A protein has these predicted regions:
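Membrane-interface helix-loop junctions in multi-pass transporters/channels
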Residues: 1-129
């Protein structure tokens, strides 16, 4: 399979997943809190961090064929996660006079994201041993 097709297949799956998860969590936050909070972007970014930790730990041990790395990591996780939307939503929080929430959102994405990558890698290392 050509690399571009592998990335495209994964990208399609990741983009559709992000759209559906974000739509569902936006609706949930509106019903629960009366306004939309960026839970969807946070959820997909953290899930993507966890899964990239898992997949890259497997890749380091040569447990995943190269084509699946392209499908899952570059394609699916590349389109599932979104730095641009995270940045846009952060600016939106600042503009809506919620600087504390904006700062919390930035710190939470970074800290929880790093923890999720490390957790994913640790899970695989514990299983493979």
């Amino acid at each position: 399979m050509p690399d571009w097709l592998a990335v495209g297949i994964g990208g399609f799956a990741g983009a559709i997943s992000r759209f559906q998860i974000t739509l569902w969590l936006s609706s949930w936050s509106t019903q629960r809190f009366g306004r939309v909070y960026p839970f969807g972007t946070f959820a997909v970014n953290i899930a993507g961090c966890l899964f990239i930790g898992i997949l890259m730990a497997l890749a380091m041990d040569k447990k995943i064929p190269d084509v699946w790395q392209k499908i899952l990591v570059t394609g699916c996780l590349g389109s599932l996660t979104t730095f641009s939307t995270f940045s846009y939503e952060t600016i939106g929080l600042f503009r809506s006079d919620r600087p504390s929430l904006a700062a919390l959102y930035v710190v939470a994405n970074l800290v929880v994201g790093l923890i999720a990558v490390a957790a994913g890698m640790s899970i695989i290392k514990a299983i493979i041993r």
